[in-house]
Regions:
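Patatin-like phospholipase
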Residues: 108-195, 210-482
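C-terminal motif of bacterial Sec signal peptides marking the signal peptidase cleavage site
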Residues: 103-106
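N-terminal export leaders
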Residues: 89-93
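N-terminal secretory signal peptides that target proteins for export/translocation
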Residues: 1-87
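Hydrophobic helical h-region of N-terminal Sec-dependent signal peptides
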Residues: 96-98
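Gly/Ala-rich beta-loop-alpha elbow adjacent to hydrolase catalytic centers
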Residues: 197-198, 202
Length: 482
């Protein structure tokens, strides 16, 4: 006997489908491959969610919600069981979200936003702060006007060489950059940087690199002592009543642990010397990169400075869909609004604001005579193509495509930076994870993997690391080097 569908205004779910969800597919999840299991569960979520949405969150919702939560629980368990190996972490998570992005909506419990109107989107100052941020894609004169306005000035360093550092994102691959910096310190050749920039996991490294080798012990600890549960907790229920797949409260607590009042005072002291620390986030409403002058925040004497400092670091590391976006409160015309900020790597995986090259050394008093400028770029990832057999299913294809997109976006950022250095006569130096590094993760933020990667970076830098002088595909000939 054919089961009559329970018809609803926009879509339907049959009793057969309900029993399939309750009995068949859930029993088979543990026997399925990861990709197949996730796709089966996603289909189940689709069927139930269509019904919930069509009911407009009213009658008959309890039954559908119970079924939904059971499927989500199985989905959650499957995610915990997955052993991410060859697939990059960010791409794997984005792939999962892309596969189920259309499955959710309608009944969210997120508090409503008071979105900053488009007409006021150019509002750059936050109440109580001045000249602490600027658009990362603004014209060079606009950036220079903000960074140089009322700029702290101090006695110039005696060195005629100006050293600049840019650190990319990379999630747990940030262990490479951390190890490289610590090894560089122990080799006795790491310079003091006039400018440090960071994005995503690079944003968590940058403040420690900015403060110098005295903070190397903490940098090592952050990237070798913690595991996934110390960074985030799976929250698949967020797919139906939230804004993210995971809860990043543990990461927020870690940031609070290391970024305390004394830390902020050190940042402020170095900014007073004319040194600059920039962290990048992405404003989702405007689709634009935002660069934050963290030293000015530290120097502001605003009681909310430490909270904002921490919030920006968290926002820069917030992969949208995986972690909830960070709301930044702004006040315009006596009214309170909010902006949504996420991973700076969405718009720039590594960055240097071009106009800063021209005046970072002149930001000191008396004006410093610089005869040479060096830029060091740490790319926390592999640059070379990596072969992988891709299964012909939605999840595998989506994940592989996104990982390829991310890798090539990062290479494009390197090309952009390289062209600026060639134009302005700056010595370009690039470090990235060696292609022969073969350690495999058992899960995201696997301590064994991160320790091995940290050690690899440390060993390279402590034995006179050979920095690459150009991005991939632009290898210089001996004549060009001269």
């Amino acid at each position: 006997m054919t089961t009559k569908p329970t018809r609803i205004r926009r879509g339907f779910i049959t009793e057969v489908q309900v029993r399939w969800v309750q009995n068949g597919s859930l029993r088979n999840v543990e026997k399925s491959s990861d990709a197949l299991a996730i796709n089966v569960l996603a289909i189940n979520v689709l069927a139930i969610n269509r019904s919930i949405m069509s009911l407009r969150c009213r009658e008959k919702r309890p039954l559908m919600m119970r079924l939904m939560r059971r499927v989500i629980a199985a989905f959650d368990q499957k995610l915990r069981d997955i052993r991410y190996q060859a697939v990059p972490r960010r791409a794997a998570l984005l792939g999962l979200i892309s596969s189920i992005a259309l499955l959710t909506g309608g009944c969210a419990t997120i508090s409503p936003r008071n979105v900053l109107p488009q007409a006021n989107a150019g509002q750059i100052d936050l109440e109580g702060f001045h000249n602490i941020r600027f658009w990362g894609d603004a014209s060079a004169p606009a950036i220079e006007a903000i960074v140089m306005a009322d700029a702290p000035r101090a006695q110039a360093q005696s060195s005629p060489v100006s050293n600049l550092l840019a650190i990319s994102g990379g999630a747990d691959d940030g262990a490479f950059g951390a190890g490289l910096l610590v090894g560089w310190s122990d080799a006795g050749t790491r310079p003091m940087f006039d400018l440090v920039t960071g994005v995503s996991s690079g944003a968590l490294i940058a403040p420690f690199a900015f403060l110098g080798r005295e903070r190397d012990g903490q940098l090592r600890e952050i990237f070798t002592k913690y595991e996934r549960k110390d960074i985030y907790i799976y929250n698949v229920h967020g797919l139906i009543d939230g804004s993210a797949l995971a809860d990043d409260t543990p990461l927020a607590h870690l940031i609070e642990k290391y970024v305390d009042a004394a830390f902020l005072q050190e940042i402020a002291r170095e900014r007073a010397k004319g040194r600059i620390l920039l962290i990048g986030t992405t404003n989702l409403d405007t689709q634009r990169p935002v660069l934050w002058d963290m030293g000015r925040i530290a120097m502001s004497n605003n009681r909310d400075a430490i909270s904002l400092f921490r919030k920006i670091l968290l926002a820069s590391a917030t992969l949208p869909g995986v972690f909830p976006p960070v709301r930044i409160q702004v006040r315009v015309g006596g009214k309170d609004y909010d902006e949504l900020h996420v991973d700076g790597g969405i718009t720039r995986q590594v960055f240097i604001a071009p106009s800063i090259f021209s005046f970072v050394a002149g930001n000191q008093k008396p004006a410093r005579t610089v005869t040479k400028r060096r830029l060091y770029v740490i790319r926390n990832g592999k640059i070379d193509p990596e072969w992988q057999s891709v299964s012909e299913n939605v999840l595998s294809i989506t994940t592989r495509s996104i990982s390829t997109l991310i890798k090539n976006q990062g290479i494009g950022d390197l090309y952009r930076i390289y062209s600026i250095t060639k134009r302005d006569g700056i010595d370009f130096n690039l470090a990235s994870i060696p292609s022969d590094f073969s350690e495999v993760r058992s899960e995201p933020f696997d301590p064994r993997y991160m320790n091995a990667l940290f050690d690899r970076g440390y060993d390279l830098a402590s034995h006179t690391y050979s920095w690459v002088k150009s991005p991939p595909g632009l290898e210089l000939t001996p004549q060009a080097r001269n």
